[in-house]
Amino acid sequence: MTNDSEIVVEEKISGPISDWLSNNGFENIPLKEDHLGIEVIKISPNNLLTIVEALKNDGFNYLQCQGGYDEGPGLNIVCFYNLIEMNELKEDISPREVRLKVFLDRNGDLTVPSLYSLFRGADWQERETFDMYGVNFQGHPHPKRLLMPEDWKGWPLRKDYVQPDFYEMQDAY
């Protein structure tokens, strides 16, 4: 039983990377760490490129993964980025890691800056996120579908996607 007059104090969830970003003037919102204990940070699409560039300059030199997911009908489309500091480490030391998340209103502007200029490995990962969720990556050199046919309508991994009854494959000849 709880007393209504008790003040609930939330546990501080910011970690060293979020604190470093805040101390250097980068807007961010720390989220609860993931199941592996890795720091998760929410950032705005407008700050993505500058924050990732700052993190890369601070040693996060490898984009392990970029992807997206749909929180559900009427909710956000989320782009996530897993960055790692790849250095030669002693056997008992783990590399620094961080997870960045950009939350996009599904009915708003689904545009984020491409990280291709910083990490060439973002190429096909961003194209897959575009292909499956409809997120546009501004500045991407090859902004076209990767998995679905070029004339496909819609974004198949969105939870509000309605699958067509019939799709006629076009003969390449």
Curated annotation (Swiss-Prot):
Concerning InterPro entries, the annotation shows: NADH_DH_suC (IPR010218), NADH_quin_OxRdtase_su_C/D-like (IPR037232), NADH_UbQ_OxRdtase_30kDa_su (IPR001268), NADH_UbQ_OxRdtase_CS (IPR020396)
One annotated Gene Ontology cellular component of this protein: plasma membrane-derived thylakoid membrane
Q: How does this protein lie in the membrane?
A: Peripheral membrane protein
Superkingdom of origin organism: Bacteria
GO biological process terms, alphabetically, are: photosynthesis, light reaction
Family membership, please give it. Answer: Belongs to the complex I 30 kDa subunit family.
* HAMAP family according to UniProt: NDH1_NuoC
Biological function: NDH-1 shuttles electrons from an unknown electron donor, via FMN and iron-sulfur (Fe-S) centers, to quinones in the respiratory and/or the photosynthetic chain. The immediate electron acceptor for the enzyme in this species is believed to be plastoquinone. Couples the redox reaction to proton translocation, and thus conserves the redox energy in a proton gradient. Cyanobacterial NDH-1 also plays a role in inorganic carbon-concentration.
Which protein are we looking at?
Answer: NAD(P)H-quinone oxidoreductase subunit J
Species this chain originates from: Prochlorococcus marinus (strain NATL2A)
Q: Tell me the name of the encoding gene.
A: ndhJ
